[in-house]
Structure formats: C-alpha cells, structure tokens
C-alpha cells in the first residue's frame, strides 16, 4: 500500500499494486534476478545510487511489516548491517509498528526473490546489500 510520492514511475507503480504480505526486493548490483521477476534497474555506475539511497526512497513510499536479510551480511558487511538496522528502527518509529527482521541464507534469499513482485537493483557494490521487504497495511 502506497503512503507517499516517488518520481520513478516503475517503482511507484509496483508499490501501488502491493497487497498485504506481498514482497519487494532492493538489491545490490550483483544479485542474480530471476527472469520471471520484474526488474527495475536503477544502477547507473558502481555505487550510484547506493543501496541505502534506494531503500530510503522505497521505504518512504511503502508500508513495511517485515524484512528478510541474508545472514551473511552480519559477517561480511557489518557496517551496512548496522546502518540497515538503524534505518529499520527509525522506520518502525515513523510507521508506528514493529518490523519483524528475519534472517536466511544467501542461497535461500536468492530463491525467495523469484516470489517477489519486483526486484529494484541499486548500484551498490558491497557484499550482501540485499533486502526483501514484506508489505504491511496502513490501517
């Protein structure tokens, strides 16, 4: 369910079509995207836009009730992991709900992307900079 405005028409469209528990992926430049899943490619060059920039825009527009993250981010990208947890903490306060954080293996994560409504690819080039957002409702 949409809750704001975004300039990218593909992102705006996919968020407006999300129902409760539907999923949307924000990923780094290297995540394989299944052919069966809609790809919204925002990557311009390495690092542009960053994972956190794309995630910030998407979560400003989307009501989030849960997220799925690869367990490997804790060891291989701890700085981004901490930044991500801080972002989710602020998002919880802004939305007025608790966001469930689930961890899975990177292999399972990649399989789950096939079930998502779309995958939004950032220009991020750091390991495991990927998240599955599970849509909530605003009421």
Curated annotation (Swiss-Prot):
Any one Gene Ontology molecular-function term assigned to this protein's record: monosaccharide binding
Enzyme class: isomerase
Record keywords: Carbohydrate metabolism, Cytoplasm, Isomerase
A matching Pfam family: RbsD_FucU
EC nos: 5.4.99.62
Domain of life according to the entry: Bacteria
Active-site residues, Swiss-Prot/TrEMBL: 20
Catalytic reaction equation(s): beta-D-ribopyranose = beta-D-ribofuranose
Pathway field: Carbohydrate metabolism; D-ribose degradation; D-ribose 5-phosphate from beta-D-ribopyranose: step 1/2
Stored InterPro entries: D-ribose_pyranase, RbsD-like_sf, RbsD_FucU
Binding positions for substrate per the UniProt entry: 28, 106, 128-130
Subunit and partners: Homodecamer.
Family: Belongs to the RbsD / FucU family. RbsD subfamily.
Function description: Catalyzes the interconversion of beta-pyran and beta-furan forms of D-ribose.
Protein name according to UniProt: D-ribose pyranase
Species this protein is from: Escherichia coli O127:H6 (strain E2348/69 / EPEC)
Protein encoded by which gene: rbsD
């Amino acid at each position: 369910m949409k809750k704001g405005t975004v300039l990218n028409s593909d992102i705006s469209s996919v968020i407006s079509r999300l129902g409760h528990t539907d999923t949307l992926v924000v990923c780094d430049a290297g995540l394989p995207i299944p052919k069966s899943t809609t790809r919204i490619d925002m990557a311009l060059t390495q690092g542009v836009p960053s994972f956190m920039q794309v995630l910030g825009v998407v979560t400003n527009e989307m009501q989030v009730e849960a997220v799925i993250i690869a367990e490997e981010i804790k060891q291989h990208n701890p700085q981004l992991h901490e930044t991500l947890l801080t972002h989710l903490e602020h998002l919880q306060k802004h939305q007025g709900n608790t966001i469930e954080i689930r961890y899975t293996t990177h292999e399972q994560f990649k399989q789950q992307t096939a079930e998502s409504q779309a995958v939004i690819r950032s220009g991020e080039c750091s390991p495991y900079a990927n998240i599955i957002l599970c849509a909530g409702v605003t009421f």
